[in-house]
A protein has these predicted regions:
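Long, low-complexity, intrinsically disordered segments enriched in glycines and aromatic residues
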Residues: 53-162
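A surface-exposed partner-binding patch
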Residues: 1-99, 162, 166-173
């Protein structure tokens, strides 16, 4: 697994290769304002991505949402409700109502998958653990091994993300 400083450099390099020009980076002031608005701290690696790579516009498939700014942002998309737990920040819209989100209250910053399309009566059943940490999730993108990669999805032994074990308790709080 890559060290945090190494992974940020690898993400920036890949983002520049794929996207060319990237959006502006986020300032300390903008991060502080986002924290205040959200009401919880952001994982250090996530902050570094927004400050050292770009304010969104990079990453797997549909690209990370900007943290702040005009239009759709992670901060604007966040809002605890009956199906969205406090402290879980959406970072990528997969389409069809699905999101990748980071559990900002867990020190490991796991990346969760919100997949509501089965129409669960129990919203906890719409939450899955995509990756045990943001670092591992980014590595799966960098290495081409994420579930969203066509080769991985089409494989007979394609992995299914496990249910998020904290979903029920976190949705109740």
């Amino acid at each position: 697994m890559s060290a945090p400083s190494d992974i940020v450099a690898r993400v920036r390099e890949r983002a520049l290769q794929e996207r060319g020009e990237l959006p502006a980076r986020v300032s300390e002031w903008e991060v502080a304002a986002a924290r205040r608005e959200l009401g919880f701290p952001l994982p250090r690696l996530l902050v570094r991505l927004y400050q050292e790579v770009a304010n969104g516009g990079f990453g797997p498939e549909y690209l990370l949402l900007p943290l702040v700014g005009e239009g759709r942002t992670a901060v604007a998309e966040y809002g605890p409700c009956e199906y969205w737990p406090h402290g879980v920040l959406p970072i990528l819209d997969w389409g069809c109502g699905m999101y990748a989100a980071v559990d900002c209250l867990d020190p490991d910053a796991p990346v969760l998958l919100f997949e509501p399309n089965a129409g669960p009566e129990d919203w906890a059943k719409a939450w899955f653990t995509d990756s045990p940490s943001l670092t591992l999730w980014l590595n799966s993108w960098l290495d081409g091994t994420g579930w969203w990669e066509e080769e991985v999805m089409m494989a007979e032994d394609a992995p299914e993300p496990p249910p998020w074990p904290d979903a029920t308790s976190r949705l109740a709080s």
